[in-house]
Amino acid sequence: MSDDQSLSEVEMSPVGSEDPSLTPDPLPPHAHSSPDDDEETKVKKEQDSEDERFPVCIREAVSQVLSGYDWTLVPMPVRVNGGSKSKPHVKRPMNAFMVWAQAARRKLADQYPHLHNAELSKTLGKLWRLLNENDKRPFIEEAERLRMQHKKDHPDYKYQPRRRKNGKPNPGEGDGSSEAEGGAASIQAHYKNSHLDHRHGSPMSDGNSEHSAGQSHGPPTPPTTPKTELQAGKSDGKRDGSRSLGEGGKPHIDFGNVDIGEISHDVMANMETFDVNEFDQYLPPNGHAGHPSHIGGYTSSYGLSGALAAGPSAWALAKQHPQTDSKAQVKTESSSTSHYTEQPSTSQLTYTSLGLPHYGSAFPSISRPQFDYADHQPSSSYYSHSSQASSLYSAFSYMGPPQRPLYTAISDSPSVAQSHSPTHWEQPVYTTLSRP
């Protein structure tokens, strides 16, 4: 009973109701998504193919609804990427492979509707490559016919490939440009890091001297290194310098108080390391019992050479101006530990003129004239004493800025030991190492 009733309802409802709103419309997507004639013919074909699914009454109702609608009111689809909306886009004529692929795709899609479109395209491409010339000839002829027809239909046709609107370059170009930019950036970063390592690796450099030298003789690229990297390089450089100096178990000398403003940028940029043991040839015969020289690896190109004269009681620092070739002023400073332990009331500095190329002849008999500054009490003495006089290096650790003397001693006295300096050196100018 229920089956008969449902069948009668199915047969009665569409035929009896002529109101389009009450009519069941099984194909609304086909109706509303087919704006032009080609689409409409496809819809009719699909409707014909679906004749077996629906009974006759439903088909009649659908055709009545569709025929009563004016399809010219449906707007034409606007292409998203279309250049000018006034001109319809003219496609290129198909080549031989496109002719083959389109015909084969339609046939295969009808036979195997479950095939994925991408897999179908791959298979069609493989099959096309396997075809010989005789198999390809009909498709080539059809493509030539289509090309001639296209030429007649569109005599002014000019192939204009569309540009991508997102502004992205082609993948190959993008890779090449990114590689070039990355290479330039890495080279620039390597230059900056090596520059910082050269400067901070030397025991003489600290922050202020690095900045002043960088501003006066800066590299051609602007200093854009982040501050964190700069501080890291600074700490690494100081660590390296202290490691190279502290291998002998002695605290390193703080060369941050040495003025390096006169050192040229070329010398600083072309620094090379060398073996510290080369200094042994400059030691005097009686000085081998003393401490070896542990001044850092960059001292030769800086013009700073350290050697120890006559055991641990004297230490000489020779600073040479790299700009002058034949005549150079040598600023030397030698200080005796015993002077500070025995006479802490006056600060005494011993100045010795050293000819840098002639260390062997200059060191054995060094006279130490003493310059007394009676007006300066131990509060203004250059070094801390009595508590750090145990070792040679600790006796020369510099004091803080408030305790440094601000005087400069320049002496033209003939009592300075000139007998050991070579004849081609001028009268040396003696200054205490102080910062303005």
Curated annotation (Swiss-Prot):
InterPro entries: HMG_box_dom (IPR009071), HMG_box_dom_sf (IPR036910), Sox_N (IPR022151), SOX_TF (IPR050917). SUPFAM superfamilies: HMG-box. The keyword Transcription applies. CDD domains: HMG-box_SoxE (cd22031). One of its GO terms (biological process) is positive regulation of DNA-templated transcription. It comes from the Eukaryota. One of its GO terms (molecular function) is DNA-binding transcription factor activity. Its main location: cytoplasm. The transactivation domains TAM and TAC (for transactivation domain in the middle and at the C-terminus, respectively) are required to contact transcriptional coactivators and basal transcriptional machinery components and thereby induce gene transactivation. This is Transcription factor Sox-10. It comes from Xenopus tropicalis (Western clawed frog). The gene is sox10.
